[in-house]
Curated annotation (Swiss-Prot):
Chain location of the short sequence motif Prevents secretion from ER per the record: 374-377
GO biological process terms, semicolon-separated: ERAD pathway; protein folding in endoplasmic reticulum; protein refolding; protein transport; response to unfolded protein
UniProt keyword list: Chaperone, Endoplasmic reticulum, Metal-binding, Protein transport, Repeat, Signal, Transport, Zinc, Zinc-finger
Cell location: Endoplasmic reticulum lumen
Organism: Saccharomyces cerevisiae (strain ATCC 204508 / S288c)
Pfam families the record matches: DnaJ, DnaJ_C, DnaJ_CXXCXGXG
Listed name of the protein: DnaJ-related protein SCJ1
Residue spans, zinc finger CR-type: 156-237
Annotated CXXCXGXG motif repeat ranges: 169-176, 185-192, 211-218, 225-232
Signal sequence bounds: 1-21
GO MF entry, a single one: Hsp70 protein binding
Sequence motif Cell attachment site, residues: 288-290
Amino acid sequence: MIPKLYIHLILSLLLLPLILAQDYYAILEIDKDATEKEIKSAYRQLSKKYHPDKNAGSEEAHQKFIEVGEAYDVLSDPEKKKIYDQFGADAVKNGGGGGGPGGPGAGGFHDPFDIFERMFQGGHGGPGGGFGQRQRQRGPMIKVQEKLSLKQFYSGSSIEFTLNLNDECDACHGSGSADGKLAQCPDCQGRGVIIQVLRMGIMTQQIQQMCGRCGGTGQIIKNECKTCHGKKVTKKNKFFHVDVPPGAPRNYMDTRVGEAEKGPDFDAGDLVIEFKEKDTENMGYRRRGDNLYRTEVLSAAEALYGGWQRTIEFLDENKPVKLSRPAHVVVSNGEVEVVKGFGMPKGSKGYGDLYIDYVVVMPKTFKSGQNMLKDEL
């Protein structure tokens, strides 16, 4: 796999003609005779527009943010602006401006996040680049399964269960620190990102990367909490109660927004409880949508002579299924009888139907006295 740094180098080479012809006025979308106030106003608008916190995951926006900062760094400095107006961006990048060694005038630029902090927070920005706080990530969605019998799906059910989930550590209040104090990350100076400056001949390219030491938080823990060992979270049992409505569909899901695992550095994700139907305990009924199906076996005598009746236990204990045939009424093998209103509940729309599939079991042989049946058939 090609390292990210090499990918950035390749992209930089491809963008070389564009970078060499950089127009700082065009980047800030202002005229060449723009006043200091207009330059500052343009920077304020564009830096907020392209700030990484508002464009998470967009490399293009991150690059725009760096370009806008670079343009403002030059045009807001009278000396740099004068050199740029006379000799172009290359002269500024190669040290045409004044300044001490390693400073902005020594062929380099201020960190774009430092510029942003000075503009919006008077140089006292906290972690996260000065644009409020970094966008809080959401924790992962957690999906759990519970199994219900067909009867529970029919009648509705109340389910209670407990899950062992991550939650903020009570001992350190989610700080991960025994004394509750966090130190500024020395690698990124609390910004959460590191700006790498690549110089290739006359070209200068700035690349923003998440700080590996602090994981982008801008802070590190020096004195770890003894309970959570600096993880900021501990496992806790959480109780849940779910009401499954009568007639709920198979694979019914109840979503609890923001009730999954949570921590101080992210918002809790969603908990999804999915209800599956058990393979057993269906009392001989099968479900397809809002309708129920059942197979009833008849003897040859019942099928041919009729005169029988059956009472079958139903999913509703107060509502038995009654089947019958008058005498001399034949039931064919594979015949289907529809019992209206004995399907699954449909809320205000009533009930589905029950389909009885009859299977006739014939004897292997007939007795001599049954030969008259052959003549009738």
